[in-house]
């Protein structure tokens, strides 16, 4: 991958977190994502699912800030994101799964999850809606959600969502 491709990928990853477009990632971005999901799926913030989503958003923010907020100002700039989050997540993709899992689990529950064999799943359509609400273009959301249904049964397991999100945010550096 060349440097221009790397920069494009980083910009997309950063924009996915920067929900309000103010050029930095902060707690408000994670809360905004939670609020959008709750509104889209008609879930009240004070119910168990709503509280779990906000708790997951806070855990996600704390994890992101812990690995990327170098100056401690409770904001992650693009430079901090590239130098901190992207590098650390590339070095340890499992770390991303750890910090993202509570939010993703709660998001799946809000999207209308069902339990199958002890795992949480959501329909492909629900995951597609969630991706659109979080800022993905319609065609990208459709393709991404469809690709997560690996067995073709119309549902997507939590583990598949976590793995896919971790893979998406693990950006390989450009060729030297």
Locate the predicted segments by residue.
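Solvent-exposed, charged amphipathic helical/linker segments at domain boundaries
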Residues: 90-98
């Amino acid at each position: 991958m060349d440097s221009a491709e790397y920069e494009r990928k980083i910009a997309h990853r950063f924009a996915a977190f920067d929900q309000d477009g103010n050029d930095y990632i902060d707690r408000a971005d994670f809360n905004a994502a939670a609020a959008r999901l709750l509104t889209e799926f008609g879930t009240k913030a004070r119910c168990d699912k709503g509280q779990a989503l906000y708790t997951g958003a806070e855990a996600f923010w704390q994890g992101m800030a812990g690995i990327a907020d170098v100056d401690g100002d409770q904001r992650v700039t693009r430079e901090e994101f590239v130098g901190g989050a992207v590098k650390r997540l590339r070095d340890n993709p499992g770390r991303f799964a750890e910090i993202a899992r509570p939010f993703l689990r709660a998001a799946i529950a809000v999207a209308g999850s069902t339990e199958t064999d002890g795992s949480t799943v959501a329909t492909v359509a629900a995951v597609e809606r969630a991706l659109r609400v979080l800022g993905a273009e319609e065609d990208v959301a459709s393709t991404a959600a469809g690709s997560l249904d690996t067995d073709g049964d119309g549902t997507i397991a939590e583990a598949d969502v976590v793995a896919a999100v971790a893979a998406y945010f693990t950006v390989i550096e450009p060729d030297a």
